[in-house]
Amino acid sequence: MAPDHDHDHDHDHNHDHDHGDDEFADELDEFLGEFQELLGTDPEAAMELVESVDESFASHPLIRIAHAHAVWVTKGAASARAELEALVTAEPDFSDAHYALADVYGELKEDALRVTHFLRVLELDEKDDAEAGFDASAFQGLIVKSAEAALAGLPSPYLERLKDVPVLLEQRPSKVLVKDGFDPRALALFEGPTVESAGSDEISAPSRIVLYTANLPAEFEDEEELASEIEITLLHEIGSYYSLSDEELDRLGLE
């Protein structure tokens, strides 16, 4: 199995705080955008930024998780652990906090705790989508079209070789998969024997590529960006299937 861990998820969360008006929401979005950019380029500056917020805003869950991420990047997972544990205790329905804590536990090799919080993420994401009236099926047409375009554009011999590998759509990873440690917010799944092991006596299921129709739109709301990411995600899964080298991935368009 090869889940895609390269993206931060972005579910909307409706917490009732004193600053729940539109103006505050806009300011928060602007702040978090600046914070995320700094976190990737200058983590120390990101820490300074998040610690400079007004005390009246500092208790907001999104500010608290931003601070925890800054601690994680600048001081390590062990330092971020207590902060995230306190956050999920205070905000037990905040799925992003459970997700971040699961990743911290993963880095600390606390696999059982990681799975516990991954399962909570799966439960909360399903609940959040239901309450928001999110319909993943509305994106199926775009996802199918983008996947077909990606496959049709493959260079030989991959196009011919993939004719027997099904590309399936599922809303999100199953509970069984997540219990096994699979990321509940993965964009895609490669499952089954690789080409090299296709002759093994241990094969019990055909290879398949799964795209998760609830997770992809949650990550990329703009249709053009979503279509591009579907293609990239699918190509990564093809790369996993064939165990391609970096040079071979370049041929597929994954520089």
Each language-model region and where it sits:
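Histidine-centered metal-binding segments
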Residues: 1-22
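A metal-dependent hydrolase signature that marks the N-terminal structural subdomain at the beginning
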Residues: 100, 106-193
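Short alpha-helical functional segments enriched in proximate histidine and acidic residues
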Residues: 157, 237-241
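Active-site beta-strand/loop microenvironment that shapes enzyme catalytic pockets
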Residues: 234
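Charge-dense, low-complexity intrinsically disordered segments
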Residues: 22-25, 40, 74, 137, ...
